[in-house]
Amino acid sequence: MEILCEDNISLSSIPNSLMQLGDGPRLYHNDFNSRDANTSEASNWTIDAENRTNLSCEGYLPPTCLSILHLQEKNWSALLTTVVIILTIAGNILVIMAVSLEKKLQNATNYFLMSLAIADMLLGFLVMPVSMLTILYGYRWPLPSKLCAIWIYLDVLFSTASIMHLCAISLDRYVAIQNPIHHSRFNSRTKAFLKIIAVWTISVGISMPIPVFGLQDDSKVFKEGSCLLADDNFVLIGSFVAFFIPLTIMVITYFLTIKSLQKEATLCVSDLSTRAKLASFSFLPQSSLSSEKLFQRSIHREPGSYAGRRTMQSISNEQKACKVLGIVFFLFVVMWCPFFITNIMAVICKESCNENVIGALLNVFVWIGYLSSAVNPLVYTLFNKTYRSAFSRYIQCQYKENRKPLQLILVNTIPALAYKSSQLQVGQKKNSQEDAEQTVDDCSMVTLGKQQSEENCTDNIETVNEKVSCV
């Protein structure tokens, strides 16, 4: 059936999904120019019975017809953005649950990652759905004008908080590598939460001018009906303060951390090789009178000793953690750099650049940046066994780890065995001390007998005494 985009047209065969557009684009408007309606170059539409629109437009296309032409494209955009929103919210909720419930994950770095997950989750709840709504309305602001400044404020706040968290993680790990004793002494849970509060305070301070000035002057947050930052000075300064400066600090400290870990690994290997050369030593144990032989015992310390393994293991764990964080840093930089670079280009080459092209690039790049909030939980799942196990249990609604029977047996029996072994060691120590005291008494008695025999034997009688060794 053919449908003409005119005022007096009968639209009986249009699907309900096209008729119920609400306040969005309609098939016709009252202000449609009559001369355009009377023109012979009308646009023909063919709609089949399966609610699938076959568009065959001929001649002049009024704006209302163009809006329907782009309807299918908007549906695909809405579908993709919905997938990103669901992944962002669900994945970051799993991260928050894992750090809150798993004791293995409760350390300073994972507290930062949990706070980062909170920022990403709020971005998915409060910012992304509104951004998807603007796409469906042709990047026009469909909500009350006062909410525009609030929405931009939340967008800048959570995006800035993400980069600030990554910068703080990089700095914290660098300090931990450089001063491990000082860091371990003062790196309590309270200190970690104070650092997180400082990160959020900085993020709020950077983004606060947006609602302060945007609510007073709509021209700073509106441009041609679209909700976006229109103040070039704030765009330029905010991009450097909220992204490029923290990015520089994060990259420098990360590479310094990698360099320090490599240096420590080299020193540890050389130290182990030095210990291997001085691997043997001997000592003389105590002996009783019944056994006067001297025993020698040699203990050989190999490079794989417990102390060496512990040092190498700690360095290996740090390297693995830096690898995972490096992937998170890299993905964040790759996904947000195009947006901020294009944002600065829009200010610098405002006259020479094509505004339509710049605007289209910004609309695409901002969603690529949003995608970074969804990929972090995937990175944790791929590269961290504890996160992977926790996520798998949470999806199955199992919030506590189920221990196997063998683990329960070991948990119940090992403390008793340890107690018995400690009691045995204490008994052995007491017995050895009693033997040593008895040995000393025997030695003193022998010495006293020797002295008395020497006093009584004044004649030319030679007395042969046994040599007694008490070591």
Swiss-Prot record:
Main subcellular localisation: membrane
Domain of life the protein comes from: Eukaryota
InterPro entries per UniProt: 5HT2A_rcpt (IPR000455), 5HT_rcpt (IPR002231), GPCR_Rhodpsn (IPR000276), GPCR_Rhodpsn_7TM (IPR017452)
Ribosomal protein keyword on record: no
Record entry for activity regulation: G-protein coupled receptor activity is regulated by lipids: oleamide increases HTR2A-mediated activity.
Topology versus the membrane: Multi-pass membrane protein
Cytoplasmic side: 98-111, 172-191, 259-322, 383-471
Subcellular location per the Swiss-Prot or TrEMBL entry: Cell membrane; Cell projection, Axon; Cytoplasmic vesicle; Membrane, Caveola
Ranges of the Extracellular topological domain: 1-80, 138-146, 216-232, 349-356
GO BP annotations, alphabetical order: artery smooth muscle contraction; behavioral response to cocaine; chemical synaptic transmission; detection of mechanical stimulus involved in sensory perception of pain; detection of temperature stimulus involved in sensory perception of pain; G protein-coupled receptor signaling pathway, coupled to cyclic nucleotide second messenger; G protein-coupled serotonin receptor signaling pathway; glycolytic process
GO MF, one example: protein tyrosine kinase activator activity
Disulfide topology: 148-227, 349-353
Physiological role: G-protein coupled receptor for 5-hydroxytryptamine (serotonin). Also functions as a receptor for various drugs and psychoactive substances, including mescaline, psilocybin, 1-(2,5-dimethoxy-4-iodophenyl)-2-aminopropane (DOI) and lysergic acid diethylamide (LSD). Ligand binding causes a conformation change that triggers signaling via guanine nucleotide-binding proteins (G proteins) and modulates the activity of downstream effectors.
Subunit (UniProt): Interacts (via C-terminus) with MPDZ and PATJ. May interact (via C-terminus) with MPP3, PRDX6, DLG4, DLG1, CASK, APBA1 and MAGI2. Interacts with GRM2 and DRD2; this may affect signaling.
Domain note: The PDZ domain-binding motif is involved in the interaction with PATJ, CASK, APBA1, DLG1 and DLG4.
Similarity field: Belongs to the G-protein coupled receptor 1 family.
Protein name, per record: 5-hydroxytryptamine receptor 2A
Species this chain originates from: Rattus norvegicus (Rat)
Lineage per the UniProt record: Eukaryota, Metazoa, Chordata, Craniata, Vertebrata
Encoding gene (name): Htr2a
